[in-house]
């Protein structure tokens, strides 16, 4: 396994903007590698080393860690790919994609002003605010995309599967965060939390079935490495679009 300089690794993983900033943090004893304070920014470190930076976040939000867990679990490479982040919010998913080498990310959200400044000013990022993905013109967003990611609240992924198809082409990879509290019935939650594992698993199956109906092959599911609000257990599902885009920007799986 090839080792990289620590300062290079810190920049690649998004902790610092450049090597000089990383060096200052190392000299200030703010960086640990495998639970030992680093004394040199030039030390060679394995890619899978445990790196901890005091008072620094790797991603702009917790969502980045969720998506990173999925990319690792699925072995998904996004280098050089065009991506769409549906429900981008602060931009945790987008941040993760860019750090993983994505060529570009289009960020779509119904709200305004939430996207982190570091992403807003990144030339690889296109921002679409106050946009309802159900009503959006796929062409205006830049569809079809190589990768779709989705982290949505108050609406289930299952209901939007045909929309995802309209944004896809044959081979498009979809990775979505399944939040059982928004996929299940109100009587199946307790103060907004789905505690019954059988209910959680059923919601995942329903999302996979909806994706299949829309032309996707749901190839994998993994539990999110961190929980959602109030300790909700969440899941990430990966699917590949098997249809093809037709006139009007709608994938075959998006037809009724």
Where are these regions (language model features)?
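Conserved SAM-binding loop of SAM-dependent methyltransferases across substrates and taxa
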Residues: 90-101
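Conserved alpha-helix/loop element of class I SAM-dependent methyltransferases that forms part
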Residues: 62-81
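Core SAM-dependent methyltransferase catalytic element
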Residues: 226-250, 255
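S-adenosyl-L-methionine
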Residues: 106-159
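A basic, amphipathic helix-loop patch mediating RNA/tRNA/ribosome contacts
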Residues: 1-47
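Conserved class I S-adenosyl-L-methionine
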Residues: 79-89
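A short glycine-rich, Lys/Arg-flanked "PGG" loop and its adjoining helix->strand segment in the class I
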Residues: 158-175
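Short, glycine-/aromatic-enriched active-site segment of Class I SAM-dependent methyltransferases
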Residues: 180-196
């Amino acid at each position: 396994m090839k080792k990289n300089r620590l300062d290079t690794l810190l920049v690649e993983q998004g902790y610092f903007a450049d090597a000089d900033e990383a060096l200052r943090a190392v000299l200030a004893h703010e960086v640990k590698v495998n639970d030992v304070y680093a004394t040199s920014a030039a030390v060679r470190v394995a890619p899978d080393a445990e790196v901890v930076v005091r008072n620094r976040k790797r991603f702009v939000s917790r969502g980045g860690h969720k998506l990173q867990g999925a990319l690792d679990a699925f072995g998904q490479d996004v280098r050089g790919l065009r991506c769409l982040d549906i429900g981008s919010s602060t931009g945790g998913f987008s941040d993760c994609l860019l750090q993983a080498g994505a060529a570009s990310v289009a960020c779509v959200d119904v709200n305004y002003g939430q996207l982190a400044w570091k992403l807003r000013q990144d030339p690889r990022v296109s921002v679409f605010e106050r946009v309802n993905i159900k009503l959006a013109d796929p062409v205006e967003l830049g569809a079809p995309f190589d990768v779709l990611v989705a982290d949505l609240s108050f609406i289930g992924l299952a209901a939007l599967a045909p929309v995802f198809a309209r944004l896809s082409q044959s081979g498009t990879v979809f990775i979505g965060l399944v939040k059982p509290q928004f996929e299940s019935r109100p009587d199946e939650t307790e103060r907004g939390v789905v505690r019954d594992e059988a209910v959680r698993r059923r919601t995942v199956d329903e999302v996979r079935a909806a994706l299949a109906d829309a032309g996707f092959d749901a190839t994998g599911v993994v539990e999110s490495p961190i929980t959602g609000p109030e300790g909700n257990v969440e899941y990430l599902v990966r699917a590949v679009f098997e249809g093809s885009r037709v006139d009007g920007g709608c994938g075959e799986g998006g037809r009724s």
